[in-house]
Amino acid sequence: MLYTMRVYALFLLLVMSVFSAEAQFRKITKAPSTENHFLISGVIYHYDIVKGNEMPAAHAQIVVYQNKELYVAFFGGADGTYSFYLPVGFEYEVWFGGSAFANKKLFIDATQLPEEKKPREVTLDVSLFRAVEGIDFSILNEPYVRMEYNPESDSMRVDEEYTRKRKVELDKSLKKAKKLLQSAKG
């Protein structure tokens, strides 16, 4: 009896995951949508802390939360590129990185974005790095970039002052990480 219940429970989980995967696939379609939406695209780079250079990050994970609930998760391309549509009228938190990198978060307030037939486009390149044990990267627990609609320019705009402050803090941690990694190599 217990064995039958376990098999049934596993079967239900399998069926639910198949439907969930299908729904997520539909959400990230790159075909133009008939609903009001905006497009986010760019390149995800892997930043080498020691060498100070970047290269495209193949298959980096992207997780999107809509109004604080999981909306979709997928991987960028082999060349580091990503592109996806999101409906207007919501707040989003987009996590770039997954388990391979220290995650960077993007907060998007699309609640004031006007509804239109044409899609708006946001281009955002993201630089990720691997976490270094012993270095505090808690600065990344909060969004690194904030973006919202600016009616004067009729476009989505990055909060430059907020991002600049976050970058100063992150640069301090990256400098410590570089020093630690270089001293470990001797």
Role assignments for model-derived ranges:
Residues 8-17:
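Sec-dependent N-terminal signal peptides
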Residues 95-111:
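A short, solvent-exposed loop/turn motif at the edges and junctions
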Residues 38-40, 49-67, 149-153:
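Short, ordered, surface-exposed loop/turn motifs in non-cytosolic proteins
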Residues 24-31, 111-154:
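Extracellular beta-sheet/turn segments enriched in Thr/Pro/Gly and aliphatic residues
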Residues 67-81:
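Short, acidic Ser/Thr/Gly-rich low-complexity loop/linker segments typical of extracellular
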Residues 23-39, 45:
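Beta-strand-rich domain onsets/edges
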Residues 1-8:
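Positively charged n-region of N-terminal signal peptides that target proteins for export
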Residues 83-92, 99:
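Short Pro-Gly-centered beta-turn/loop motif in secreted/extracellular proteins
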